Amino acid sequence: MRLRRVTEARLPTLWGNFLIVGFEENFTGHNHIALIYGNITGSDPVLTRIHSECLTGDALFSSRCDCGFQLKTALHCITEEKRGILIYHRQEGRNIGLLNKIRAYALQDNGADTVEANQCLGFAPDERDFTICADILKLLRVKKIRILTNNPKKVEILNKSCINITERVPLIVGRNPENSRYLDTKASKLGHLFYSYHK
């Protein structure tokens, strides 16, 4: 296992009381967290959101993406479900880092789309490693989930990592004039899906 469970505490939020669990990667020291709501033990699939870090969307309420909207909606859905997990996957800017994400924004301001901007900076369209999230689920002893995502790459990688996904639950929120091109590019170039998936 590439990471370990380090610490946990109660985390009261606008949506209810979660348990926040901190994880640390063994070789890099990078940290990730999971927010757990309710009882996630048992054989029923657990509603799960893997949310990649987005400082601009999550904390600064940027309209350039749908990340902040997705974060709030996911927390609401999990509490409505009475049980669930949100993994906060700390790979900012599809894992190119915050400063490179700002550089990518500047390229987008000059006409590039989100994929072209990454490539202009020498990165793949998506540099994230979702196997870390599979390891977190295994440390939480969760093997069967319903995943809140529009991203088929997450489904594919988690399935390959022996996480049983029984349903893909779309999370389609936050479209606005500032991010409509970004969302269209995610669909056309990154393969994001906007319909539900049942196994």
From Swiss-Prot:
Cofactor: Zn(2+)
EC number: 3.5.4.25
Record keyword Transmembrane helix present: no
GO BP field: riboflavin biosynthetic process
Cofactor note: Binds 1 zinc ion per subunit.
Protein family according to the UniProt entry: Belongs to the GTP cyclohydrolase II family.
Assembly information from the UniProt record: Homodimer.
Name of this protein: GTP cyclohydrolase-2
Organism: Blochmanniella pennsylvanica (strain BPEN)
Gene this protein is translated from: ribA
